[in-house]
Amino acid sequence: MKNLNKYILWTGVLLACGPTTLFAGAWTLPAGELWTKVTYFHQTADEWYIASPEFGNGQIQEVGERRPYRFNGQYESKALFAEAFYGLTDRLDIGLQVPYFAQEYADDTRFDTPSDSGIGDVRLFAKWRVISQPALFTLKVGTKMPTGDFKNEDGIVPVGEGQWDFDFVGQVGRSFWPLPLYANLGVGYRVRMKNVEVDRDPGDEWFYNAEVGINIGSRLLLMAKFEGLRSDPSVDFGSIKNRSQIKRVTYFNPALSVGLGGGTALELGLRSTLNGRNFAAGHQLTAGLSAGFGK
């Protein structure tokens, strides 16, 4: 069960940075303005993209094939993300994200249902708009701090990972006004530090987010997003390279945002996996409420 818990945990890893799009891609806030958002996330999964070849249905299942969890397993995650960005200048923003997780995993080998809940790992961000023409280009850096409770217990999906991350992201954005269209592209590299408690380096990651949006009238925004993550293998006990912990996932996320007036908007999304490796498969539902505040 230890190995099973490891690959389930990686679902939670992406949740810490995935289900919400931090403020407006490459755009930065005007000086003195505050942008806030609270997002609810829910996922129930009984399938995953396998991490290693398996034998099933009379044949070998290749890495990345979508298969049911062993022993009728089912993973459920509920999360709430609170985040805020503040414009220090017209070009420089700082941001904060605080997640709350409630996660559990059950299968036919257990009489109980192991679960964990609580505040997860907090993230801090800074964004600097380098240029504005002919398109926006922004550099974003971030860190994930091990503030969540990491539990190395059989069957538990912990809310914290017990290690630091450092993100480096380049973002390009373009408005196509007078057409009511915009596009964003972000590509980042995540340096993942060792979890000293279990002597495990989870492996660095590349990640990306591509997004296009169109305004329908003055209040409705339709969006289409592609998101992905690719990781290196983990290194266990100082020198053992564990390729079964390589992670891959690609999401398609159609979403809509409805302006409620006064700088407030409601966003709804359905995030679906297209392919992966060592990752939960299926759909994720999100609902977010954002608000902006002037000086």
Describe these PLM feature segments.
Residues 38, 82-86, 96, 124-128, ...:
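Residues on the lipid-exposed face of transmembrane beta-strands in outer-membrane beta-barrel proteins
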Residues 40-46, 98-104, 143-149, 174-176, ...:
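Transmembrane beta-strands of outer-membrane beta-barrel pores
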Residues 49, 57-67, 202, 207, ...:
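Outer membrane beta-barrel transmembrane domains
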Residues 102-201:
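Outer-membrane pore/translocation modules
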